[in-house]
Amino acid sequence: RHDIQKNADGSWTANGHMPLEDLVQYVPLPLDEKREYHTIAGLLMEYLQRIPQPGEEVQVGDYLLKTLQIENHRVQKVQLIPLRDEEELDFEV
């Protein structure tokens, strides 16, 4: 999928419009079943209650979500940075 790619440092870079249902197949983020948002951009805006600025970071579960690129008030690119080594993260559902 071109919506997300793994970086050499173990982080991920994803499109802001990537559906969260697809994202969690790569990155184990905790999602609220009652959420009103369906994309990474929506998740960031829900946490911040506004449009994020480039470079702004939000912690979600064991990941730091860093806004990389904004165009026309839309989140285009987000970096997902694991806060712990992947070996420590439990991927079992």
Regions found by a protein language model. Give the residues of each.
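Cytosolic regulatory modules rich in charged/polar residues
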Residues: R1-V93
